[in-house]
Regions:
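Class I SAM-dependent methyltransferase SAM/SAH-binding core
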Residues: 39-41, 45-98
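Short alpha-helix
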Residues: 186-201
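C-terminal helical/coil "lid" or tail adjacent to the Rossmann-like core of SAM-dependent
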Residues: 4-5, 206-260
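A short acidic, Gly/Pro-enriched loop at the edge of an enzyme's catalytic core
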Residues: 101-110
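Conserved class I S-adenosyl-L-methionine
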Residues: 140-170
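Conserved alpha-helix/loop element of class I SAM-dependent methyltransferases that forms part
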Residues: 17-34, 51
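A short SAM/SAH-binding and catalytic strip from SAM-dependent methyltransferases
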Residues: 109-122, 145
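A short glycine-rich, Lys/Arg-flanked "PGG" loop and its adjoining helix->strand segment in the class I
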Residues: 123-135
Length: 278
């Protein structure tokens, strides 16, 4: 389902250096490079897939499954990654929730970067992931959409940014958000609830990492052009009008507050099937 057009996708944000470091941290904490059969769930245009490839201790006999719901993203990933001699990269068109059907064999590691918050039935997905792992397999994920991801010293920025953007939206476009149900990424779990989710599926948590990241202007500017972000903070507003208002409001507040970065917290979790009962 290639919706909301490629103009409003996550790609430009996903290649920013600070965001790459966030995902590198997860892969290194989970020691994904030691594994042979690896799923990159929600791979997008292949940014994390490339990071996995760079960390492989041995490429021989390695199989990577790059899974995404967007055929356009998978095509871009295949072009970006290219042919590999010693390993196989399989590009799989599927929703994350259909993992059982998308990947037939058991794998050593499943990586899910900054997307688990979108999944409506997270418990069902994590159970699928457990069933798909080999006996000592690893599940690693991160997210910046959880209760507590905004440090207290970022609250003033967000309040001013949203208020200014809403005023711009009303003044320049005569629009206001439609106050309806939240999109799934805005219905947020706490970090502890994510841990409970993993443990309830029968996995053992190995890494529970909260990482404060200083996000530069470019990060907030790019995320303001992402359809899910716009729909989350300005539900019902046309994407082009929402993006324009958010980015204009951001620029004004950034200058007025004389900011260099604004912090956000990423949760990174690695869990193992080790010693769990089949």
């Amino acid at each position: 389902m290639d919706t909301a057009s490629e103009e409003y996708n996550f790609t430009s944000f996903s290649y920013l250096p600070f965001y790459t470091k966030v995902n590198v941290r997860l892969l290194d904490l989970a020691e994904v490079g030691k594994q042979r059969k690896i799923v990159d769930l929600g791979c997008g245009t292949g940014g994390v897939t490339k990071l996995i490839l760079e960390r492989l201790q041995s490429a021989k006999d390695t199989v990577i499954y790059a899974v995404d719901h967007s055929t356009t993203a998978l095509k871009a990933a295949a072009e970006e990654i290219g042919e590999r001699k010693e390993l196989v990269v399989n590009y799989v068109h599927s929703e994350a929730q259909n993992l059982t059907d998308a990947v037939k064999e058991r794998v050593d590691a499943i990586v899910y970067c900054n997307s688990i918050h979108y999944v409506p039935d997270k418990a069902k997905l994590v159970k699928q992931i457990k069933e798909k792992l080999t006996p000592q397999g690893i599940f690693a994920f991160n997210t910046s959409f959880f209760e507590g991801s905004h440090p207290e010293d970022s609250h003033e920025f967000f309040r001013k940014w949203m208020m200014r953007s809403l005023r711009i939206l009303k003044r320049e476009h005569g629009l206001s958000p439609i106050k309806s149900g939240k999109v799934e990424s805005r219905v947020q779990l706490t970090a502890n609830q994510y841990i409970d989710l993993v443990e309830s599926a029968g996995l053992k948590v190995l890494v529970n990492d909260l990482n404060r990241v200083e996000v530069p202007h470019e990060g907030w500017h790019q995320i303001s052009g992402f359809s899910d972000w716009i729909e989350g903070v300005m539900p019902g507003v046309p994407l082009d009008k929402g993006r324009e208002s958010l980015q204009k409001g951001l620029g004004q507040i950034w200058t007025e507050m004389e900011l260099k970065t604004v912090p956000r917290v990423w949760l990174s979790v690695s869990a193992s099937k080790f010693n769990t009962v089949e």
